[in-house]
Amino acid sequence: MFFDVLGYENSQSSIKINLDLLETNIINIFILIIILIYLGRKFLGNILINRQNRVITSIRESEERLEKSTIRLNEAKNQLSSAQIIINQIKQEAKNTAANVKESILKQGKTDIERLLLNTKNYIYNTELQIKKQIKQQIAALALQKVQSKLKDELDNNIQQKIIDQSLAMLTIRNK
């Protein structure tokens, strides 16, 4: 059947080409193709133009989105680098602050130790003074007791009276 349209004849022994244009309908097929091209050209042309316009619009929108995305990406990179700079500054400030705090604590500790040493030295000095004073008082008390006991043993009433009179005379002379 297909071969009939093209003008081929099937015989038992050979294939023959039918050159009669009217029998093979080649003219009709050719006319049909021309009509389809003429009428379909507008229809297919409009479809293809619409499709082309949609593709071009999609490409433009994609390019615009790409540009916007690239701009946002660059902004994000700039923000990231700014954030990294700020983070590095914060780290450096933290190191400096830690060093300053450490130095301050060491100075304060040294000052506290010096103050404690001074307080301890003062306490020891004052304690020594009190102990010396107590020792002197005890020595004086013991000396007085010893002198009193010696005087009681060696002095009689007349000598005691003379000493008292001399002491009173000296006091009266001083008071005048």
Swiss-Prot record:
GO molecular function: ATP binding; proton-transporting ATP synthase activity, rotational mechanism
GO cellular component labels: chloroplast thylakoid membrane; proton-transporting ATP synthase complex
Keyword Chloroplast: yes
Location in or out of the cell: Plastid, Chloroplast thylakoid membrane
Family: Belongs to the ATPase B chain family.
PANTHER family the UniProt entry points to: ATP SYNTHASE SUBUNIT B, CHLOROPLASTIC
Miscellaneous comment text of the record: In plastids the F-type ATPase is also known as CF(1)CF(0).
Entry protein name: ATP synthase subunit b, chloroplastic
Species of the source: Galdieria sulphuraria (Red alga)
